Curated annotation (Swiss-Prot):
Cofactor: FAD
GO molecular function, one term: 2-hydroxyglutarate dehydrogenase activity
The protein's name: Probable malate:quinone oxidoreductase
Any GO BP: tricarboxylic acid cycle
Catalytic activity: (S)-malate + a quinone = a quinol + oxaloacetate
Enzyme class, broadest EC rank: oxidoreductase
Pathway named in the protein's UniProt entry: Carbohydrate metabolism; tricarboxylic acid cycle; oxaloacetate from (S)-malate (quinone route): step 1/1
Record-stated family: Belongs to the MQO family.
Length: 553
């Protein structure tokens, strides 16, 4: 009998403890702040999604959590990227030469179409007062391709001729004339051997973009809204699924003794740049198991000498050396950062195991697990030229980098230039049923099956296409909402070309160029023949050329 009483007593203690735990848990759940949307990361992607959602569903509550002491301090920061408004006007890796010698322009059309969506999105935000003074974040900067040598000149001419099939590229000019090119970029031609065979394309509709400034203005606007909260110096430590399908996310305030904070969010977006993969893995969603990552950094030579800077107004892209990946493509770039004009040359690849410039040296190790280690090793074998290139880059001396600059700027003086370490770019490695693992280009949206959590992986073309990338994300995770007449009407108001292919209509191209150039205070667009229909389909080729890694700086 005594034994039975002891068992009952023990059982009561256990049940009481369980009841206390349940009560505590219920009280905790009741006290935890509830939000419709949690944005992890304070960069261009999260801020763009925040503005999109505020436009489409202004009654939704949002919280943004950023690990650093301010927004736009990582990859979106103007000093951590080249600020190119990527539209395939100059970047030769978007137009590979196929085995039959023809130039494939399908990727170039896709990239350009995407950037036109970004231009329209920014123009709308200027009209609404969300973005102030367009010159603070976007400026007309001609985009050009510049090559030398018979084979490269031949390639560039074929590229130019192929692109003329699309109205998106008909504002482009081509020249092999020394004097003409000197008019476009005097700094690049002075001191050059006049007998050297060179060629260039020149497109005046190109832009330089300060993505950090766009981010700061977007977040500055969101902070004025009553249902938006920003938490800085906040590092996410836990992401777990609640029984009701929402996500419980906890973070700690760095440099502070404040207790951990948390929210229960109906939807979580992880826009943490290089930190996104680790957080997706921490969430436990099976979709994250398909991915691994490899970090590549970039450095630039920088000059702020006004006598040098005033001689160059262009983003001039070259061609990668034979056997080198596209990330080795150097470019001599005009930049306008916080109102000051400078010139960057690079990038030169660097390596660190960090996934973020302000990350941890353990990032690569922490992201590697039993699910992705085999695909990562497979890519290391298949992409050996990339490994060789990185090894070679790490061995470059200051003289090597300066000699590379002199190929573009023959009269460069060493004392005018300094080396700047830019941001980290994390290349996506995805499990492949046939190859084991493949290196993925571009950005990739990784979302749970129910659409309650999503993250963005990858780099190229990155911030330039934040608006269309976030639009595609919303189509994936808010499919039913996007299909409603209310959202459809609003999206078309923000992006007039939504649902159409500008490539198919020269008249629409001119209309969009004119509208966005006017609102964004850019140079008037070039005149093109609207009566000549597009001869480019923009569809992917049946036998695409082998893709290579792209650092997208």
């Amino acid at each position: 009998m005594k034994k039975g009483s002891a068992v009952i007593k023990t059982l009561r203690v256990i049940l009481s403890a369980l009841a206390l735990c349940v009560a505590t848990s219920s009280a905790h759940a009741a006290d935890t702040k509830k939000v419709d949307v949690l944005l992890v990361g304070g960069g261009i992607m999260s801020s763009t999604l925040g503005v999109w959602l505020h436009e489409l569903q202004p009654d939704w509550s949002m919280t943004m959590v950023e690990r650093l002491d301010g927004v736009a301090l990582e990859s979106s920061n103007g000093w951590n990227n080249a600020g190119t408004g990527h539209s395939a006007l100059a970047e030769l890796n978007y137009t590979p030469e196929k085995a039959d010698g023809k130039i494939d322009i399908s990727k170039a059309i896709e990239i350009n179409e995407s950037f036109q969506i970004s231009r329209q999105f920014w123009a709308w935000q200027v009209k609404q007062g969300v973005l102030k003074n367009p010159h603070s974040f976007i400026n007309s900067t001609p985009h050009m391709s510049f090559v030398w040598g018979d084979d490269n000149v031949r390639f560039l001419k074929k590229r130019y001729e192929a692109l003329q099939a699309s109205p998106l590229f008909r504002g482009m000019q081509y020249s092999e004339d020394y004097d003409q090119i000197k008019q476009w970029v005097p700094l690049m031609m002075e001191g050059r051997d006049p007998k050297q065979k060179v060629a260039a394309t020149w497109t005046p509709i190109g832009t330089d973009v300060n993505f950090g400034e766009i981010t700061r203005q977007f977040v500055g606007y969101l902070k004025t809204q009553p249902n938006f909260t920003l938490s800085l110096s906040s590092e996410v430590r836990e992401i777990s699924r609640n029984a009701d399908g929402t996500w419980h996310v906890s973070w700690v305030k760095l440099h502070s003794d404040e207790p951990a904070q948390s929210v229960d969010a109906k939807f979580v977006f992880i826009g943490a740049g290089g930190g996104a993969l680790h957080l997706l893995q921490a969430s436990g969603v099976p979709e994250a198991k398909d991915y691994g990552a490899f970090p590549v950094g970039g450095s630039f030579l920088v000059t702020e000498n006004p006598e040098v800077v005033k001689q160059h107004l262009a983003k001039a892209y070259g061609k990668a050396s034979v056997g080198s990946p596209p990330m080795s493509v150097p470019h001599l770039d005009t930049r306008i950062i916080d109102g000051k004009k400078i010139i960057l040359f690079g990038p030169f690849a660097t390596f660190s195991t960090k996934f973020l410039k302000n990350g941890s040296y353990f990032d690569l190790l922490k992201s590697t697990n039993t699910h992705n280690v085999a695909p990562m090793m497979r890519v290391g074998v298949d992409e050996f030229p990339l490994v060789q290139y990185l090894a070679g880059q790490l061995m470059l001396s200051d003289d090597d980098r300066f000699n590379a600059l002199k190929e573009y700027f023959p009269n460069a003086k060493k004392e005018d230039w300094r080396l700047w370490q830019a941001g980290q770019r994390v290349q996506i490695i995805k499990r492949d049923p046939v190859k084991g693992g493949v290196l993925k280009l571009g950005t990739e949206i990784v979302a749970s099956q129910d659409g309650s959590i999503a993250g963005l992986l990858g780099a190229s073309p990155g911030a330039s296409t934040a608006a269309p990338i976030m639009l595609n994300l919303m189509k994936k995770v808010f499919k039913d909402k996007v299909a409603t007449p209310e959202w459809q009407q609003k999206i078309r108001q923000i992006v007039p070309s939504y649902g159409t292919k500008l490539n198919d209509s020269p008249a629409k191209v001119v209309e969009e160029w004119t509208y966005t150039s006017d609102v964004l205070q850019l140079s008037p667009p070039p005149k093109i023949d609207v009566n000549t229909p597009s001869q480019a389909t923009g569809t992917a080729p049946a036998r695409p050329a082998k893709a290579s890694a792209d650092m997208a700086l």
